[in-house]
């Protein structure tokens, strides 16, 4: 019985174990089921979320891809902000044919001042180890030891007369503390209509510069991208003052931009009294920046802009928290000759794509195909348009309504445009700086010893006209030895990514400088190339250089530089000849005393000989010997004669040099300097063609 009880107990225990095991398995299965269900639900949620259609506004796109517009980092953002404001100011003044007068101020703002501006109270640190610039005792000891070794090495170098290096600046691990700057740009240009200011500055990809024409801007963003960067880095709005000619009020607007909606957010928009009748615009924005890293780029930009726009006056000021770091530079105006205003032009048939053809059709006011071809494109006359329509096929006629064209017909038009022959577009719509302005700008800023300029005739690349202007200078101030290359596209300086640019590669690899008597390593050579076009073929996302793979542009740049080199070669050769002539004259004058002394000694010995022993001489020789004996002819006499002869030869060579240089062919005009006091004994008889002066 006990055994049976034991067996029963064992059996019951076994059953309980099985039941527990099955319960555990069921629980695990249930948990696994829940896990799978949760995973499936998560996957469905992810799929549903990924299937949602999202949109980004243009402002949001450029905010997330700010490097495209030149806002890679705080330093370059400061440079790009200043550049955009300056170029807008130039465009504004030139649009009303006003000589630009532009003032740029970059003011450094300390962290405490910035916090006060935004109403933020400075807070003392509580947990020092939380901050990136925290330095432990061990790290501090290590740094001080390293600095001591560096100072010891520098002291030894100084004692030995070697170059002493500056101590390296300490670098933090992270971004460090931000630096803020107020950038202000004031001009005397057109100004902006009061009601248009919010949309002109607070809505990305809206403006007045869109169309087929030569423009300074690369993206059409201008100050709008500076406002986006301000929104991202400081959160502060932009302030605008503007007034147009004839207005008795100044428009004041304080606004920022709604990044997600791409619409302006206006804080204040009002009219103020304009007592001085000022016209133009003044923009002020506060951004994060870095003056230290991009100081040289900003100053180089201003100097190069002063070269290409000598008709403009720039006043640049940097205001630091430390007065000893303040900087003021004025780039004075040198001429009042301004380039013509760029004209908007029509598209060349060979430069359009299918999408552009569709847009032109949707915007045209012309009804039939003949009128559309004749009026919406350049270089298509009526007869040419009729020939093109006849070539398109039986489905086309001169009276075909352009709005009714099918997609297949549009493709046919596009294909014919790519295959047909058209005259090249003219460069009348372009606005180059001009040789005169380029030369004046180079002379004004560099003060070179020699300068040559050349402007090419209009040429074409992919249906877009372009003009290349070049200048080369030798010598000058603040110019390094070797090649100093200054690049311009649509009259704005290009400072970044120089190595891959067509201008740089042409100057370095395609010009044999030595054949033009120019020493590429030792001479101070300034190479200036400006390319203007309705479409600059920039490379890279930042549009900082023009590619070297465009044969038409590379050939035009090389030709323009060679023309400048040829001009310089003739000048250099003439200078070398003049220098050789001066050296020859100096060397001859150096030997005159010795030659005169030798001649005098020889003649003295001959004169001392008795007549029977002396050879028979001509009468003139005998007279000379007698003068030597009587000391009527001395060593100084021969010196004077030789000096006079050298002067005569030098004069004849200089006259021949002048005649070869064409100086004698230039018109000459007599100039008279008369005292304001006193009377003169002559009479002038005036005639339309001459003045006859009678001097008694």
UniProtKB/Swiss-Prot annotation:
InterPro entries reported in the protein's UniProt record: HATPase_C_sf, Ribosomal_Su5_D2-typ_SF, Ribsml_uS5_D2-typ_fold_subgr, TopoVI_B, TopoVI_B_transducer
Catalyzed reactions per annotation: ATP-dependent breakage, passage and rejoining of double-stranded DNA
Biased composition (Low complexity): 20-36
Keyword ATP-binding applies: yes
Function: Component of the DNA topoisomerase VI involved in chromatin organization and progression of endoreduplication cycles. Relaxes both positive and negative superturns and exhibits a strong decatenase activity. The B subunit binds ATP. May be involved in cell proliferation and stress tolerance.
EC number: 5.6.2.2
Source organism: Oryza sativa subsp. indica
Keyword list, A-Z: ATP-binding, DNA-binding, Isomerase, Nucleotide-binding, Nucleus, Topoisomerase
Database matches in HAMAP family: Top6B
Disordered, as annotated region: 1-36
Compartment(s) where it occurs, according to its Swiss-Prot or TrEMBL record: Nucleus
BP term (GO), one: DNA endoreduplication
Binding residues annotated for ATP, in chain numbering: 88, 187, 208-209, 217-224, 543
Tissues of expression: Highly expressed in flowers before pollination. Expressed in roots and shoots.
Principal location class: nucleus
Induction per the UniProt record: By auxin, abscisic acid (ABA) and benzylaminopurine.
One example GO MF annotation: DNA topoisomerase type II (double strand cut, ATP-hydrolyzing) activity
Family under the similarity heading: Belongs to the TOP6B family.
Name this protein carries in UniProt: DNA topoisomerase 6 subunit B
One Gene Ontology CC term in the entry: nucleus
Subunit description: Homodimer. Heterotetramer of two TOP6A and two TOP6B subunits. Interacts with SPO11-2 and TOP6A3.
Keyword Transmembrane helix: no
């Amino acid at each position: 019985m006990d055994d049976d009880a034991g067996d029963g107990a064992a059996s019951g225990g076994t059953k309980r174990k099985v039941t527990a095991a099955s319960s555990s398995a069921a629980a695990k299965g249930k948990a696994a089921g829940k896990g799978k269900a949760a995973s499936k639900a998560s996957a469905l949620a992810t799929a549903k979320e990924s299937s949602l259609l999202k949109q980004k506004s243009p402002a949001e796109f450029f905010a997330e891809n700010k490097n495209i517009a030149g806002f890679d980092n705080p330093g370059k953002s400061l440079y790009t902000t200043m550049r955009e404001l300056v170029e807008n100011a130039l465009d504004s003044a030139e649009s009303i044919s006003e000589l630009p007068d532009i003032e740029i101020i970059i003011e450094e703002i300390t962290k405490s001042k910035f916090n006060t501006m935004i109403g933020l109270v400075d807070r003392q640190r509580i947990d020092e180890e939380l901050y990136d610039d925290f330095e432990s005792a061990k790290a501090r000891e290590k740094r001080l030891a390293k600095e001591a070794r560096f100072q010891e090495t520098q002291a030894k170098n100084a004692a030995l007369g070697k170059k002493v290096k500056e101590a390296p600046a300490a670098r933090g691990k992270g971004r460090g503390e931000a630096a803020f700057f107020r950038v202000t740009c004031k001009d005397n240009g057109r100004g902006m209509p009061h009601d248009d200011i919010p949309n002109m500055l607070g809505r990305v990809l809206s403006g007045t510069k869109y169309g087929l024409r030569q423009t300074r801007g690369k993206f059409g963003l201008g100050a709008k991208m500076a406002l986006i960067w301000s929104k991202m880095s400081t959160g502060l709005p932009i302030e605008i003052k503007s007034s147009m000619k004839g207005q008795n009020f100044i428009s004041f607007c304080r606004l920022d931009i709604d990044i997600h909606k791409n619409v302006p957010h206006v804080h204040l928009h009002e009219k103020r009294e304009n007592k001085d009748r000022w016209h133009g615009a003044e923009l002020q924005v506060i951004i994060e920046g870095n003056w230290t890293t991009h100081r040289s780029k900003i100053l180089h930009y201003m100097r190069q802009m002063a070269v290409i726009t000598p008709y403009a006056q720039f006043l640049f000021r940097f205001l630091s928290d430390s007065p000893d770091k303040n900087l003021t530079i004025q780039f004075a105006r040198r001429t009042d000759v301004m380039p013509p205003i760029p004209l908007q032009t029509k598209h060349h048939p060979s430069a359009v794509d299918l999408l552009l053809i569709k847009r032109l059709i949707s915007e045209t006011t012309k009804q039939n195909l003949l009128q559309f071809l004749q009026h919406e494109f350049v270089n298509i006359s009526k007869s040419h348009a009729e020939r093109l329509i006849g070539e398109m096929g039986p489905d086309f006629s001169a009276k075909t309504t352009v709005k009714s064209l099918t997609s297949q017909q549009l493709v046919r038009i596009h294909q014919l445009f790519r295959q047909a022959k058209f005259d090249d577009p003219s460069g009348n719509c372009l606005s180059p700086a001009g040789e005169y302005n380029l030369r004046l700008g180079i002379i004004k800023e560099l003060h070179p010893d020699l300068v040559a300029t050349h402007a090419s005739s209009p040429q074409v690349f992919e249906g877009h006209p372009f003009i290349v202007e070049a200048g080369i200078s030798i010598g000058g101030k603040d110019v390094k030895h070797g090649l100093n290359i200054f690049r311009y596209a649509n009259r704005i300086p290009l400072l970044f990514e120089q190595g891959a640019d067509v201008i740089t590669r042409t100057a370095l690899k395609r010009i044999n400088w030595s054949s033009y008597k120019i020493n590429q390593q030792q001479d101070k050579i300034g190479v200036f190339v400006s390319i203007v076009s309705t479409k600059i073929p920039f490379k890279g996302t930042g549009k900082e250089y023009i590619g070297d793979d465009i044969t038409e542009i590379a050939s035009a740049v090389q030709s323009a530089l060679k023309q400048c080199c040829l001009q310089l070669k003739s000048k250099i050769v003439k200078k070398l000849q003049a220098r050789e002539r001066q050296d020859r004259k100096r060397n001859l004058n150096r030997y005159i005393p010795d030659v005169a002394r030798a001649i005098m000694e020889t003649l003295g010995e001959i004169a001392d000989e008795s007549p029977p022993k002396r050879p028979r001489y001509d009468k003139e020789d005998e007279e000379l010997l007698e003068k030597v004996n009587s000391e009527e002819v001395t060593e100084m006499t021969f010196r004077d004669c030789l000096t006079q002869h050298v002067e005569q030869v030098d004069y004849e060579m200089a006259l021949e040099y002048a005649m070869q240089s064409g100086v004698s062919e230039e018109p000459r005009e007599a100039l008279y300097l008369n005292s304001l006091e006193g009377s003169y004994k002559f009479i002038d008889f005036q005639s339309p063609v001459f003045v006859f002066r009678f001097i008694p």
